[in-house]
Amino acid sequence: MSDRLNDQAQHRLQKLLRLKQTNNDPYLVTKTSLTHSSKSFQVEFEKCSEEELKKKATVSLAGRIIAIRQTFLIIQDFDGQVQLYINKKIHPKLFDYFNEFVDIGDQIVVSGKPMLTKTKVLTLAVEEMKIIAKCLLVPPEKWHGLTDIETRARKRFLDLTYNLAMRDVFLKRTKIIKSIRSFLDQNGFIEVETPTLQAVLGGANAKPFKTHYNALKADFYLRIANEIALKKLIIGGFNKVYEMGKMFRNEGVDTTHNPEFTSIEIYQAYADFEVMLVLVEKLIQSLCESLNQFSFNWNNKTINLKTPFHKITMVELIKKVTGIDFNSVKDDQSAILLAEKHHVKLAKHQQNKQHIINLFFEQFCEQTLIEPTFVTHYPKAVSPLAKQDPSNPEFTQRFELFINGKEIANAYSELNDPLEQRKRFEQQLEEKQLGNDETSELDESFLEALSFGMVNTAGLGIGIDRLVMLLCECNSIRDVVFFPQLREHK
């Protein structure tokens, strides 16, 4: 490591070596006794007079040094910051220790008495100090000015130290996730766990990560969704279940996509997609109430999350945006001609009306959905696990919630006819032969379970990372994930 250290870092390393030589090795510390955090220190002493502070007992604190100005220091712990003062005349040995060994970035434990400076700033007058972790590398001087998202994500440990606004985002994320669980628990849902490794790919249309299970001598997938397992629980007699966890899709990375992401899927027996539409509205309202905020700025757009949200069918939306009424398009060939006219590229498996409707929506309509909008009744060809609409069998009882052009939630009345489900799986296999590498596999285990009978059921999936982006007003998914995957740093 030393060959790569610059001069300042070499100087820090020499200080560490001297600490060890003088029986002050910071890494031998195993217990740290503290009386206060920065927050409790401020709360207890901020309203005290100088005379009252003189009567207070000794206080011990710990934190990272983020600033040094002569004999004043600022340390920061999880809750905030505290100013320290070293009186050279009263504590000459302490000052010598500070002067010889201490650098910005070091983790220290201190004890002393609270005091007020001449400018009435609450400060700890240090009587004892010990370095408990030496910072060997030079920390950034102006981290707040850093705008390179990749650098911040790659060195999240520094980002969290010197950018407290980023720390607040992750605390808010934790609060949001707790609130989601609390809402569902209060509404009678049971949290469950299902396998991350899956023998059969299914539950969504996406490219998977593949691995090999040595003990079983078989290839497995990291799950792209947990839908199939959760529906098996409904078949097994559970009425309301949900699971929050990691999903994995071997696809692109951008400001709203991360191959490893957090999702929640929710299933309710004896319900349809309209029930889930109401549920997701109530859930988002509950989150806004817990945050005491209903208006959010996301990617320079003001988003109002007060319900009810807008609602429109996919075909109606396409007509509204493009003027094209797909209800009047009678066959695949007519749809193909429309696609050619409007420069919509078609893959081999997309040479039909249903896929073309979905492509028109994705290409021309998604980005127009700024205010929260439920887009309903997706084509059956792109919804292999959704129940068809009895009034129009080309379409399904499905919706997706869009906010600022981004999909936030996806829900549908679950297909529970095992014969129809087998047919849909077979159609997916046909598409795979035509080059669609995002299709589901034929899952005999699921078909067997479905054949024992699944009552009418509704399912809902929500992308937690995107929802947190919105509620924390972050423009990149990397800003709401502690350690997003990045290309190898060269």
UniProtKB/Swiss-Prot annotation:
Compartmental location: Cytoplasm
**EC number, as in UniProt:** 6.1.1.6
Species this protein is from:
Mycoplasma genitalium (strain ATCC 33530 / DSM 19775 / NCTC 10195 / G37)
Question: InterPro entries annotated for this entry?
Answer: Aa-tRNA-synt_II (IPR004364), aa-tRNA-synth_II (IPR006195), aa-tRNA-synth_II/BPL/LPL (IPR045864), Lys-tRNA-ligase_II (IPR002313), Lys-tRNA-ligase_II_N (IPR044136), Lys-tRNA-synth_II_C (IPR018149), NA-bd_OB-fold (IPR012340), NA-bd_OB_tRNA (IPR004365)
Q: Known PROSITE patterns for this protein?
A: AA_TRNA_LIGASE_II (PS50862)
**Gene3D superfamilies this protein is in?**
Bira Bifunctional Protein, Domain 2, Nucleic acid-binding proteins
Annotated residues for binding of Mg(2+) 1: 400, 407
A Gene Ontology term for the protein's cellular component: cytosol
The Swiss-Prot or TrEMBL record lists the needed cofactor(s) as: Mg(2+)
What is the top EC class of this enzyme, as a single word? ligase
Q: Which residues bind Mg(2+) 2?
A: 407
Q: How is the cofactor bound?
A: Binds 3 Mg(2+) ions per subunit.
Could you list this entry's UniProt keywords, alphabetically sorted. Answer: Aminoacyl-tRNA synthetase, ATP-binding, Cytoplasm, Ligase, Magnesium, Metal-binding, Nucleotide-binding, Protein biosynthesis
Question: What interactions and quaternary structure are annotated?
Answer: Homodimer.
Q: Does the keyword Transit peptide apply?
A: no
The answer to whether the entry has keyword Repressor is no
Report the protein name in the record.
Lysine--tRNA ligase
One Pfam family this sequence matches: tRNA_anti-codon
